[in-house]
Amino acid sequence: MTSLEMALEYIKINNVKFLRFQFVDIHGEPKNIAYPVKLGTADGEEELMGVLENGLFFDGSSIEGFVEIEDSDMVLKPDLSTLSVLPWRPSEKSVARIICDVYRKNGKPFEGDPRGCLKRVLAEFKEEFKGEYFVGPEPEFFILKNENGKWVPGDDAGYFELEPLDEGNDLRRNIVFALENLGFHVEASHHEVAPGQHEVDFKYDNAVKTADSVITFKTTIKTLAKQSGVLATFMPKPFFGMNGSGMHCNQSIWLDGKPSFYDENNAHQLSDICLSYIGGILEHTKALVSVTNPTVNSYKRLVPGYEAPVNIAWANSNRTSIIRVPAARGKGTRVEFRAPDPACNPYLAFTVMLAAGLDGVRRKLIAPEPVEKNIFAMSEAEKREANIDSVPSNLYDAIEELRQDKVLKKALGDHIFNKFIEIKTKEYDAYRTAVTDWEFNKYVRI
């Protein structure tokens, strides 16, 4: 969908009655304004063409991370290429959504728009390097059922299990059909390691399209789960003693229209650019995780054990390091950053990952030697000797690392950087001062 006329025709053919103008807040939570389509009225088509071309005004003061009430008039400008009918809504009176960029009333892009932030960094990358950034995420999630008023895993199945143990198979299949109707190229779906845990993989794309897809992916899964009487959660660690949900991010950069990570004559068949990119990610990891793992709960997943990616090192096939380079070479050469979880804002996560990697490329950092042994089995002394550090153990420490990171601050921009730190510091303080059931049960008899 690249023109107003094509968008209008799509809306007519699909009998769209409501059009959701969608955007995200600083957390990556989708928001929308539903516009009623009135093509049967005298002015309906003209009004629709007007909002598709010029956007919708809205009050941004109640959107977390946006603006104050005294300067709250903002505009949602739709990206026509994202217009899609929602397959879970009735077809006779269809609902469609269109993803928007956020602008100020003076016509300038809003510096606090996460999607706009990613687009700005990508534009700078393209201008400097003639570069493109591709990402292929692997978001995991849990399907929960309600038992006696308590949410519990939807089944007792394990990795790659089949029916009848995999009780989420039918729902997962319906999710795949819905995603395909929304334009996804779904590559695989399966039950994950933990009870009630699932994964649906879709093909990589450029960073903006992929970030859009992550938001659509989560909305689709949560909606279909609710319609099935269960709960889908992308919480990183919903249950103690079980694996958490990650969102491994496979990524590559192309320069001058060509993949840049492969060099058949270099060590590990990885180019100097790829090794420098890895070096940049490793150098900024402690600050990166504040954005890629942005909740208090994220750090309950990032603990030793449960295959958690806590070790700041890289490897080829070794999944005990935070960066892995999968076996594919040639055009398929990519870097997998294993820390992120699906609670992140994908626009901001992709922004800081690219910024960190490109910092390594610009400075021609040399990645350390890959660690091909099981880091989980290494003692603390062995890890120190090998210069293998760990990610921050909590959100507060990660935020403190972000405060000091000038590269990530520049990438995010002052508005998002300051708002993000302010919001996340308050979130951690609320957690720090809360009295948990564990504490009460542990200490009530003192």
UniProtKB/Swiss-Prot annotation:
L-glutamate binds at N243, G244, R301, E307, R319, R338. It is an enzyme of class 6 (ligase). Coiled coil: none annotated. GO terms for cellular component: cytoplasm; membrane. Residues 14-107 form the GS beta-grasp domain. Its cofactor is Mg(2+). Pfam families: Gln-synt_C (PF00120), Gln-synt_N (PF03951). It catalyses: L-glutamate + NH4(+) + ATP = L-glutamine + ADP + phosphate + H(+). Keywords: ATP-binding, Cytoplasm, Ligase, Magnesium, Metal-binding, Nucleotide-binding. Residues 114-446 form the GS catalytic domain. It is found in: Cytoplasm. SUPFAM superfamilies: Glutamine synthetase, N-terminal domain, Glutamine synthetase/guanido kinase. GO terms for biological process: glutamine biosynthetic process. Mg(2+) 2 binds at E140, E192, E199. Mg(2+) 1 binds at E138, H248, E336. Gene3D superfamilies: Glutamine synthetase, N-terminal domain, Glutamine synthetase/guanido kinase, catalytic domain. One of its GO terms (molecular function) is metal ion binding. Belongs to the glutamine synthetase family. Oligomer of 12 subunits arranged in the form of two hexagons. This is Glutamine synthetase.
